[in-house]
Amino acid sequence: MGTNPLPRIKSYVKKVGSRNFLAIDFASYMGKTMTDIKPLLYNLNNLGLITYNSAKGTIAVNGRMYRWLGARSGRMDHDVIQFISEPERGVKYNASLSLLNYDLSMEGVNSIVLSNAQGTKVFPDQGKLILKENRSFTFKGVILAGRTEIYGDEFSFDYDKFRLNLIETNWLRFFVKRKEKHTDGDLVRKLQSQLIGARGYIDIDDAKNKSGKNEKKHQYPILKCVKKTFVFYDNKNIHDGAYDREKFYFEVEPFEMDSLDNFETSGMRFDGKLISASIFPDLKETLVVQDDYSLGFIKQAPEEGISLYLGKANYENEISLSNKGLMGSGDIDYLSSHAESSAITFLPNSLSAIADL
């Protein structure tokens, strides 16, 4: 019909003083015939903006139309969420509705953008999700929130709170800014350490700023881990997997991290303790990003040294942890012997060192 008809409907409601009126009267107001206006009425009815009863010839304007107008004008908040179902060949349906709880099980939903402004989207595993009341849903798969990626077996999205609940995660990893210039122009790279077993939630944006138009909300998305998480160093590339995750791991305390889309690498700090398979006593430390893009730390042993291998030796000097392993350099006193080395590798059942002559 050329111009947007919604403002005209709003004006007509104001004129007649009611959201309920005859379709033929509205057609006359628009200077149209019923034949002209029927396709529009059916379309608006399908969108849920009005309820058009063709048998009775009546129109009822729904509240959704006013929310739609408010969102388009910028006066009201809105979201960008769309559920696009494109099932693989052989799948007979896009969705099935449970008559017990009205959950809608959807197929072929490969991705859902939750916030363009905050760079947050989800990728349901095998394109499957369960849509619940008021656009909330559950799924398994991958969450991408800014420069944070999470894979898990159970997530839920709470529309009212605009929050992703991390119920059962497998791993969480970050993409950090490169320290060096890169020829392909890639400004970020994947952190080489993962946080395992994260439980908590991600607040995508302020619940009243689902559109992301209020750009003053710089702190979002916000990740809050409410349980302890773990960093392991048992990759086969690290001394042939010598650091068994059952005995050697870093236990990260619950933490909160904001600005997941634009955080600084220097701000990534995870307090906790290293359990080192009895190489050292438990070490309270803070994980930060190391030069090899893994999470680790560098610390100085106390002046009197630190017990090594359950008191069999004493170590003095630097201790470092990264994907290079648990390393050191300095003095080692073992029984009645003394040695100095600038390259020590501490392993659960042994150490290797290049002695300084």
Model-derived segments and their meaning:
Residues 1-357:
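Structural signature for solvent-exposed beta-strand/loop edge elements and short helix-capping sites
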